[in-house]
């Protein structure tokens, strides 16, 4: 089914409009120059009904992305948080992916967006395991990309903005065309950065490591995983990680709103650890799903009911 040809509603510039009518002009500035900021958010079915995971943090990151790129989003944080709840309710969804996006309109053309209006849209739709149900259980195969992740002074890694994803698309296409499930990108110095749309963790000798975040997005799921891991008594360290550090890790996994917690069983045809989902990964994965489905009352504050 085409993303454009669906029933339902999209929140567009302050109003719920029929899905097929949520359109914009072909001369929209952001379509040509790539300057749009967006979020990926998930809602889950919980014991308190449908609830959005870490809505406040995702909305804050959207506004931070706008600030980095001098984009003044014309709504308050509170309005956009309510709009995300509203669009889930309007589409009668129990579990879904939510995509808020702010972009420049068609009021002008040219590299500078000055004079173009900022528009905001929010869509929501059902979306299961991003990297596959089997991958969640058995782990995925990953290829180190020949494309480097952006240097911090090329694009701003603290922003989740559309233009960055051209780099991600190249890496992901290269990996999937070669028969892998996902790509791992290195930074310009040759150290591990992140996946095409995920943060990376490795496990070695009972400790958890993540790459330094110079060239990687500060993931919200990543932050949740670190919190849970430390609650388990695991030491979590951010440091420069090499590709061969991943080769000889005991376990590895990706995190992200779409990817959730996805084990990595292989990198560049080299099995990671036992070549499947490791015990620490499985423990963290279970804890994560307990939290997002409302089964852990300690983290209830991370869930915002849609009603």
Task: Give residue ranges: language-model regions.
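Helix-start/capping segments and mature chain N-termini
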Residues: 1-75, 79-86, 109-307
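Short secondary-structure junctions
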Residues: 89-96, 234
């Amino acid at each position: 089914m085409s993303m454009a040809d669906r029933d339902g509603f999209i929140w567009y510039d302050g109003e719920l409009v029929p899905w097929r009518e949520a359109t914009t002009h072909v001369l929209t500035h952001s379509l040509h120059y790539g300057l749009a900021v967006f979020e990926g958010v998930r809602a889950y079915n919980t014991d308190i009904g449908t609830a959005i995971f870490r809505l406040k943090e995702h909305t804050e990151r959207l506004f931070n992305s706008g600030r980095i790129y001098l984009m003044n989003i014309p709504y308050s944080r509170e309005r956009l948080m309510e709009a995300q709840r509203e669009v889930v309710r309007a589409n009668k969804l129990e579990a879904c992916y939510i995509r808020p996006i702010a972009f420049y309109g068609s009021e002008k053309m040219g590299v500078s967006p000055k004079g173009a209006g900022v528009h905001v849209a929010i869509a929501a739709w059902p979306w299961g395991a991003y990297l596959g149900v089997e991958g969640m259980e058995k782990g995925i195969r990953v290829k180190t990309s020949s494309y480097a992740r952006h240097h911090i002074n090329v694009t701003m890694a603290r922003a989740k903005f559309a233009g960055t994803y051209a780099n991600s698309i190249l890496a992901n296409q290269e990996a999937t065309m070669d028969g892998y499930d996902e790509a791992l990108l290195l930074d310009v110095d040759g150290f591990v950065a992140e996946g095409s749309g995920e943060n990376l963790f490795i496990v070695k000798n009972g400790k958890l490591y993540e790459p330094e975040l110079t060239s990687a997005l500060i993931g919200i799921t990543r932050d949740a995983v670190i919190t849970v891991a430390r609650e388990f008594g695991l030491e979590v360290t951010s440091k420069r990680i090499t590709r061969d550090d991943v080769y000889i890790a005991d376990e590895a996994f990706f995190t992200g709103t779409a990817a959730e917690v996805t084990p990595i069983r292989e990198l560049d045809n080299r099995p990671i650890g036992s070549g499947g989902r490791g015990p620490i990964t499985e423990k963290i994965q279970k804890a994560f799903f307990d939290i997002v489905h409302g089964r852990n009352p300690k983290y209830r504050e991370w869930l915002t009911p849609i009603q």
